[in-house]
A protein has these predicted regions:
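Membrane-helix boundary/helix-loop-helix interface segments in multi-pass membrane proteins
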Residues: 2-31, 42-183
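Electropositive phosphate-/nucleotide-binding environments in soluble metabolic enzymes
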Residues: 28-32, 61, 244, 261-264
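Short amphipathic alpha-helical coupling elements at transmembrane boundaries
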Residues: 122-123, 152-155, 194, 198, ...
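Residues on a specific face of well-ordered alpha-helices
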Residues: 144, 148, 191-195, 244, ...
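Membrane-helix interface and discontinuous TM-entry motifs in multi-pass inner-membrane proteins
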Residues: 174-188, 273-286
Length: 287
């Protein structure tokens, strides 16, 4: 058997076994993901037991629904991991993927808002209403976009802007759509946090000035958030031209007891759970 034939057979087997991660995958990250996924399923089951009282079949439906999403997500991850190639990041097709994500984010604007945010695409399947949040995929795409441009150390750049300019524009466009058009402040904050970390990692000399500026702006931003959680900061938040539900998130974070039956309800119940359950909790199904 020729080496080329053996290589083809090996590649074919690897593609068929899409439920396995490639050999170069980090096993610690892989198993951590599996453990956290099943732990999350157990926590959802535990939290749903109280709602299942008087509703036959409700708990089984919740478990089955979450299990389907978990399995589908895992197989999708392994499928893409086995077919991922660094050459794809350097190809002409990768920017098309980033542009496609922009259109996916814009498509959310055609659907009804949920809790003040237009961040979901709703797909009715039989009696189910499946929702897809493109901003969650953006959190995975942002590191790839930055790696595609800032990870190119084989070329010499006279200007740092030639290195980080395009990924920075993509990140800003994602953030603008998510925050301004979708009104999803939480997702925007996560996307920007991921982008900042990814921009600070490369050691290319052409990026040092940009990284210093970004580091200073990050410290200023953190200080600003801390200030907004002070009495003077809350007064400033109340004057900002943002939606009331966004203001209430800052207010409830500062003092959840200000509206304990609405915006502060979840925070207060979290405090109660810590106080009543301690470090070990109250047991499975008692939350």
């Amino acid at each position: 058997m020729t080496a080329a034939r053996a290589s083809t057979i090996k590649a074919s087997r690897r593609h068929r076994l899409f439920y396995r991660m490639p050999h170069y995958a980090d096993p610690y990250i892989h198993w951590s993901l599996i453990i956290l996924a099943f732990y999350g399923l157990l926590m959802i089951t535990s939290a749903s037991m109280g709602l299942a009282i008087g509703q036959p079949g409700y708990l089984a439906f919740v478990i089955a629904k979450q299990a389907v999403f978990l399995i589908a997500g895992y197989f999708s991850m392994t499928y893409l991991a086995n077919r991922f190639s660094l050459n794809f990041l350097k190809s002409q097709d990768f920017p098309k993927l980033a542009v496609g994500m922009v259109f996916a984010l814009l498509a959310c604007l055609a659907f009804p808002e949920v809790n003040g945010a237009k961040a979901w695409i709703r797909v009715p399947v039989s009696s189910l209403d499946i929702s897809i949040q493109p901003s969650e995929f953006t959190k995975t795409l942002v590191p790839l976009v930055i790696a595609a441009y800032c990870g190119d150390v084989s070329r010499h750049y006279e200007k740092g802007r030639d290195l980080w300019g395009r990924p920075f524009l993509f990140v800003m466009l994602f953030a603008f759509i998510i925050f301004i058009l979708q009104s999803d402040f939480g997702s925007m904050a996560v996307v920007l946090s991921i982008a900042i970390v990814c921009f600070l990692i490369p050691q290319n000399p052409a990026m040092r000035k940009f990284q210093r500026v970004l580091g200073v702006l990050t410290l200023v931003g953190v200080a600003g958030i801390i200030y907004l959680l002070t009495p003077a900061g809350i007064q400033l938040v109340e004057m900002l031209p943002i939606a009331d539900y966004q203001k209430n998130r800052f207010i409830s974070a500062f003092n959840p007891f200000a509206d304990q039956y609405d915006t502060g309800y979840q925070l207060i119940n979290g405090l109660i759970s810590f106080a009543s359950g301690g470090w070990r909790g109250l047991g499975f199904g008692n939350s």
